[in-house]
Amino acid sequence: MTTKQIYEWLCSAPMLAGEKVNLDYLPTYDGWSMTMPRRRTDTDILGNAWESLEINITRRKSVSGNADRLAIADELDNLRFWAKQNPPEGCRVILAGIAKPKSKSASGTEDFVLTLRLEEL
């Protein structure tokens, strides 16, 4: 699966309709970005190995309190649910996790990250 295919799939999510999604760089203030997919190899406890593609989707947003943080977490949770229900053609979503922001930037924004792992079928 190509980066372009993954990017187009991500941008087709209803919650991103009309939003600009930067590819491989963070927006200055409020916005969305997606990292270039990284190929990962994992091994289970029995020694079986499989490959997947990992992408991080970042939501950078101005935050003034916990209500804002909860609203952003809901946005990412809805995107995670959509991704699991509508995986890219020929793939399945094997992991989808949301990371809490580590710190507030000088501009007053926080970065919330959704990590998706896609396994090609």
Identify the role of each PLM range:
Residues D30-M36:
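A short, hydrophobic beta-strand-centered structural micro-motif
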